[in-house]
Each structure stands twice: as structure tokens, then as C-alpha cells.
Amino acid sequence: MSDTTELVDLAVIFPDLEIELKYACADNITGKAIYQQARCLLHKDAITALAKSISIAQLSGLQLVIYDAYRPQQAQAMLWQACPDPQYVVDVTVGSNHSRGTAIDLTLRDEHGNILDMGAGFDEMHERSHAYHPSVPPAAQRNRLLLNAIMTGGGFVGISSEWWHFELPQAASYPLLADQFSCFISPGTQHVS
């Protein structure tokens, strides 16, 4: 069942926030754009936590760079088709916390304009992407710890398999939302309603 909870547009609430939606371009695990519109939306409860995280990052001379937030269920089906591994992608029949508007994917940019090295790229579905992995160089691990501190300081929690993913505590208790914008349909992708 899908809810119609109204989501908040991050570009409107935080006009200075850097938003680089990876699923609105080909720089993701599918190798193609999934979103027809580059809209970055979150549940109002996640907006409150994000505002705190933005302030904490600024205190450190850092900037958040948003890669994904709310994700239509149709997009989740396409990601599952590209990577049907429940360690990294939630099966659309289960329901991703992104599709509830309660999860966000992001990284950090320093005061010189450089994206911090996290030791593995966004959507790199490999053990190196796990929050704490021995193959990650110490400097990159410190950057992950910094991102984690900023996000948990705002009220989010991380997950063990992706350094870039944070969500509200109890995120799964929020309802799955009706798709808020369109996706490009891949052959073989099941329609989700």
C-alpha cells in the first residue's frame, strides 16, 4: 500500500545545498538515467534532521553533497533489476526507506571544493563500500567517520553496507509513498503501484 504523504523539496528549503542526483544521470549502477526529473525530496521529519546535519558540517568547514533522497518505487525496481543483491539494494517488494522519504545518500565536500575521498565510490556495490572495512585507507576511513558523525549528530543512523546511506531511526515504520515523479522504464522492469 502506498501513502500520499507530502514531501519537501530540498532545493527550495536549502537553496545553497549541493544536489547532484545520481539517478537523474548515468553515473550509477544501472549506467543510465532513471529519474525523468531531478527532484530531491524528503519527508519533513528527515528535513529537520538534515538541517541539523548541514549546520554541523558547516561548523567543520564542510558541505554536504546530496546524491539521492526520496526514490520512487519504480526506480527501486530498476535498481533491484541492476543489482538483485539484498545486501546492497532492497527488493521493491520489501520497500526501500528511500521510497518512504526517510533515507538520504550523500558525501562531503571540503572548504577547497574537493569531494572527500571515501575509499569507494557511490553505488560501488562491494565490501569496500561497507561503513568500516579493513581495505579502506586510513584517511578515507576518517572521512567516513566524519560523515557518520555529522549525520548521526543531526539525528540520522547509518547502515553497515553503504558508507553514503543514512536514514531516520525507525525509517521502516513510515509508509511507502506513491511515486512523486516519473522514471524512465527499462525493458523487463515490473510496474510498481
UniProtKB/Swiss-Prot annotation:
Signal peptide: none annotated. It comes from the Bacteria. It is found in: Cytoplasm. The keyword Protein biosynthesis does not apply. Its main location: cytoplasm. It catalyses: D-alanyl-D-alanine + H2O = 2 D-alanine. Its cofactor is Zn(2+). Catalyzes hydrolysis of the D-alanyl-D-alanine dipeptide. May have a role in cell-wall turnover. HAMAP family: A_A_dipeptidase (MF_01924). This is D-alanyl-D-alanine dipeptidase. It comes from Escherichia coli (strain K12). The lineage of its organism: Bacteria, Pseudomonadati, Pseudomonadota, Gammaproteobacteria, Enterobacterales.
